[in-house]
Amino acid sequence: MKFSRFIPRSRTPGLPAYGEQEPNTFENGYRPSPPPGAITPYLGLRSRLSQIWFNRWTILLLLILARVLVAIGSLDGNLVSAKREALSACSSVESVGSTMASMPHYMAQGVNELTATGVEKAINGLMSMLELTVTGVEEIFVFFVNVMTQTYLCLITLVVSGMMNAAIDVLKKATEFLDDITGKLGNAIGDGISDFEDAINGFGDVINMFGTKLPKLNLDGPIKELENLSLPDGLTDDLNKLKEKIPNFEDVNNFTNNALRMPFELVKKLIRDEIDDYKFDRSVFPVPAKEQLQFCNEEGGIHSFFNKLASLTSTAKKIFIGVLVVSAILVCIPMAYREMRAWRGMKERSSLVRREAHDPMDVVYIVSRPFASAAGLKAATWFSGHRRQVLARWVVAYVTSPPALFLLSLGVAGLFSCACQAMLLTAVKKEVPSLTEQVGQFADKVFFALNNASEQWAVGTNRVIDDTNDDINQKVFGWVNQTTGSVNNTLNVFVDETSNVLNRTFGGTILYEPIKDVLHCLIGLKIEGVQKALTWVSVHAKVDFPNLANDTFSLRTLEKLSKDNDSNADSFLMNPGDKTTDKISEVVQRVTDSVESGIRTEAIISAVIISIWFAVLLMAIVRALTLWYGADKNRGDGSGDSEFPHPETLSRDAAGFSDIPLATPTHVSPGMADTSVPVYTTRPPAQAFNGGYNAEDYYQEQKLGFAGQRELRRDVEGHARKSSYGEVEYTNDVKR
């Protein structure tokens, strides 16, 4: 390739002959190092430092900042769209919630009518049943009382009458027996007394002879009275009168029947009067008002959530701008320090090259890539053997070439950008649970409003039902209580009247207490049992319509209904929080998923780019390993003639180019040793083909710049450095 074809001399006035720039040279022919501030064709330290502000790392950081700002802008747009969709979804949920919370309003009228009709039918049926029950109880009660009274009173009458008749008969027979026995006894006594009187009288006559006069004994009068002794005729008169006075209890029975039937008939009359005109008042039932829920626009709702996210992204944007811009500015400091060290290192390497370089291409590489070459030299120290050290340096040079480093830096910058976006996305995701919690509270508000309306309606309706219970208990079962009281009073009157009759009949006689005990045993105990039963009826005779539950219109009741209608139903009623949460938070989740997908894609691309760099590294290592165990060659030992010999002749320009010093010596004082760089020349071209030299070895040595196969030659006399646009030509390899 001829450089003169692309850069003619006449068109490059900025590149005169190097020796013509300044005529002053050292005695060895080398141009001295230019003084500070001098004009040079290459960039000096100040020129390099003037370009620090757009170094590669600053540019990469600014590119990362630009990508992050683009991502934040896209996220802001997505959040605005998500806010709009979330508000739309919230409005629909708000409408559904308002409708559900207003459900008691729509259902109350029908339920009130149903309740009123049920109460009317229940009361009418109750009245009819009560009338029939009262009639049945009346007849049963009267029959029971009549059975007891008539049976037991007839028994008492039988017993008393039999006893009276027996007593009168006994008295009559006793009178007859007494009359008969007293007459006979009087006659016998009279006969015995007559003989005794005669004896006594004779004895008295004897006594009288002695001057004492004895009275005569005469018992005719007492004996006559004894003979006439008998029971009085009026002894049975009282018993006959008592027999005639024994009652048949007909009056008691009639009085008792009338007294027993009177309260029952009164109750039946009142029941008939109430049945005919009873109508339940529907207007007393409450009707809940409609509910209009407002939770989408309230404080702490969706607006607050998205405003918080917008503030978060704005803060993140400011932080990224501040951090990355400051980092881009601060990175100029180490880059400036790096340039200064690189400048000093380049100057040091120039002297090092003059002393120790083996290959002009190696010299150019060391000077142009100081850090990569330093890393290669450091890596080469880990191995022994010249060949392996060269291969280690070659691997480092291969993976730190500008294209490879650009590939690596591009991948690292992409990953760093993904990391920045991931931090922002993580901050956004942390706020999503708060939205889920807020949205879950929407359902709680609907549930609370519905429960509140249901509870208010139930309280009002239950109050009406309780008033109806009280009214029925006072009007109907109050009569029942009066009836039971009247029946109890009637029974008491019956007992009292019966006791009075017995008292008037048997009072003061020996039969009063036995008859009273018999009455208590046969009738009194039964009447006491009936009175206890009537008292129990009076205490428990009341109606109690059941109250409505407070959650009649609540979500639990509606949930049960929905489950009964559809066992697989998946509705807002069955799980009010989840559906609302899914419907609104899904919008935010979709945005975060979209951003996360973009970050994942960028991270994959960056990882692929970095993996390509690692693949390049692997290729370099594999290539180096294929040449790792070759034999080392001594310096200048080409192992005979090359298979592809160098050209025998070079043009004048090319020959001149081979004589150009590789660096300009520094300023030295006269008398100091010459430290100019040695001049490199190649071995004389071989004219014969060495059959023992492998073409593959030649190809590999050519790729490595024929390291170790050149002889070092130092010119003894100085010469003036000449500028040349020489042409470099190779027979088999042309580099463009």
Curated annotation (Swiss-Prot):
Extracellular compartment segments: 1-56, 161-315, 417-601
Cytoplasmic topology ranges: 78-139, 337-395, 623-736
Annotated region described as Disordered, given as residue ranges: 1-33, 717-736
Transmembrane portions of the chain: 57-77, 140-160, 316-336, 396-416, 602-622
Topology class, membrane: Multi-pass membrane protein
Main localisation: membrane
InterPro entries in alphabetical order: PRM1
Glycosylation (residues): 228, 254, 452, 481, 488, 503, 550, 565
Subcellular location: Cell membrane
UniProt keyword Aminoacyl-tRNA synthetase, yes or no: no
GO BP: plasma membrane fusion involved in cytogamy
The UniProt record lists the keyword Transmembrane helix: yes
Keywords: Cell membrane, Conjugation, Glycoprotein, Membrane, Transmembrane, Transmembrane helix
One Gene Ontology term, aspect cellular component: plasma membrane
PANTHER family per UniProt: PLASMA MEMBRANE FUSION PROTEIN PRM1 (PTHR31030:SF1)
Similarity section: Belongs to the PRM1 family.
Function: Involved in cell fusion during mating by stabilizing the plasma membrane fusion event.
Entry protein name: Plasma membrane fusion protein PRM1
Species: Ajellomyces capsulatus (strain NAm1 / WU24)
Gene: PRM1
